[in-house]
A protein has these predicted regions:
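A late C-terminal transmembrane helix in Major Facilitator Superfamily
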Residues: 338-371
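A membrane-interface helix-boundary motif in multi-pass transporters
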Residues: 109, 172-185, 364-383
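Helix-loop boundary and gating motifs at the non-cytosolic
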Residues: 5-66, 214-260
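C-terminal ends and interior cores of transmembrane alpha-helices
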Residues: 90-107, 292-304
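Intracellular juxtamembrane helix-capping segments at the cytosolic ends
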Residues: 40, 125-139, 241, 322-335
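Cytoplasmic helix-loop-helix junction between adjacent transmembrane helices
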Residues: 116-158
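Helix-to-loop junctions at the C-terminal end of transmembrane segments
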Residues: 67-81, 171, 268-282, 366
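C-terminal transmembrane helical hairpin of 12-TM major facilitator-type secondary transporters
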Residues: 283-327
Length: 424
């Protein structure tokens, strides 16, 4: 179920047995997540006639999805992707379908819509963390795994760019609720195709056999801290860019191009990062990449005009996907074999929680502080996270010691292999 290559490349990743089918299925399901936020927001606002109600319901949906993610991931680790993801996807798709039906015409009670949205968010299948755990099973070469994670991260970035565009196309000839319905359909089809892949079936068997007293080691703290710092920075950037453009008389269409430039920079940075043979370890690279993002954003606040700001934002984007890719790699290294989905979910939760918090903080500070100070604070969040992790890495390097979690993971691996040999 694993593959290695003498010349690690993105093509080698996709040539790994079952990789293309599994990855494609996961992307189909994850496209739903790129669509659902805008689709629900538009559908609820149309049904209730209130942007305030739509915003509250969307926030509740997002909170249920984000903060319960580690719990859902733990269920996947415990029961395997097939037994855990299918019920989650069925509930999630069914609830989104209910929400689509309720918002198809105006007049739906806000309380009913909020209840359905929260329930749907609570059932969101952790397809991203599960796919990254599957990459760890498909690819044993760490160099190839870096490319797999980079490819996964860039693809996810593109999904969250193309998802809103797809919603925009749909609302051109159908009610906004159609976007919610399509989102439900995508997650159902994608999850079913994903869990029936031979690669995922193998993960399910192995995950159910591994037992651990301590499933996630202390090493998970470092990637979670960096992910939270990156999320805080990214969450603040959107409002800061919007305020920067408005102060100089530019419209929303111009802002959209700057956001696209950030995503493009992240995609290019992720692909280049994954293609490099790095000598430094992942824990050394992790704070360095977060620091690069923080410095780029701090400098962006000094931009005299929109063109310069766009260039600075592109430079910041170069560090986004690499930083998150490395965070997921470190989380994977820190987790026991049967806890990889949960480890990835903690990083994912940290990013999303950071984005929400950063956006809220920026909303309070924009207009009260100069733009330069706002960008400095946004960059400072990533820099602070980088500094905290760099200190812990330096201490671990200077005072090396055996890590208990590593010993436990080795014992788990030995127990898992012994059980597999006994049942073969």
């Amino acid at each position: 179920m694993s593959a290695s290559s003498t010349r690690p490349s993105y093509a080698a990743v996709l040539r790994t047995p079952h990789a293309t089918r599994t990855f494609t299925a996961a992307l189909v399901g994850r496209l739903s997540y790129g669509m659902v936020s805008l689709a629900v927001l538009l559908a609820v606002s149309r049904a209730t006639g209130s942007y305030a109600v739509a915003g509250i319901i969307m926030a509740l949906f997002g909170a249920a999805s984000v903060f319960l993610s580690p719990l859902r991931a733990a269920l996947v680790d415990r029961h395997g992707p097939r037994r855990a993801l299918l019920p989650m996807a069925a509930l999630y798709a069914g609830l989104l379908g209910t929400l689509a039906a309720a918002t198809w015409r105006p007049g739906a009670p806000a309380a009913v819509l909020g209840t359905v949205a929260v329930a749907a968010g609570a059932c969101t299948p952790p397809l991203g963390p599960t796919m990254r755990a599957v990459w760890g099973e498909l690819v044993t070469d760490r160099r190839l795994l870096q490319r797999a994670y980079s490819l996964d991260g860039v693809a996810e970035e593109l999904l969250f760019v193309s998802g809103p565009l797809l919603v925009g196309v749909l609302v051109g000839f159908a009610p906004p609720a159609a976007g919610v319905a399509v989102s439900a359909l995508l997650v159902g089809i994608g999850t079913l195709a994903f869990v029936t892949s031979p690669a995922v079936k193998g993960v399910a068997v192995r995950a159910s056999r591994v037992r651990a007293r301590r499933r996630i080691g202390r090493g998970i703290v470092q990637p979670v801290v960096v992910a939270a710092g990156v999320g805080l920075s990214l969450g603040a950037v959107d409002l800061l860019v919007l305020a920067f453009a408005e102060q100089r008389g530019h419209g929303d269409d111009t802002v959209a191009w700057i956001f696209a430039a950030l995503s493009a920079g992240s995609a290019v940075g992720g692909l280049l990062y994954g293609a490099v043979e790095w000598r430094a370890g992942t824990r050394v690279r992790l704070p360095a990449l977060a620091a690069g993002l923080g410095l780029s954003l701090a400098v962006a606040g000094l931009a005299p005009g929109l063109a310069t700001l766009t260039g600075a934002v592109v430079c910041a984007g170069f560090f986004v996907a690499p930083a998150l890719t490395t965070a997921y790699l470190v989380a994977d290294e820190s987790a026991a074999p049967g806890a990889r989905v949960q480890a990835g979910a903690w990083v994912n939760t940290a990013v999303n929680a950071g984005i929400s918090t950063g956006a809220a903080a920026a909303g309070l500070l924009v207009g009260r502080l100069p733009g330069e100070a706002g960008f400095a604070l946004a960059g400072g969040a990533a820099l602070l996270a980088a500094a905290a992790v760099a200190v812990t890495v330096a201490v671990e390097t200077r005072y090396p010691r055996a890590r208990p979690e590593k010993q436990e993971q080795q014992q788990e691996q030995e127990q898992g292999h012994a059980q597999e040999a006994g049942t073969a």
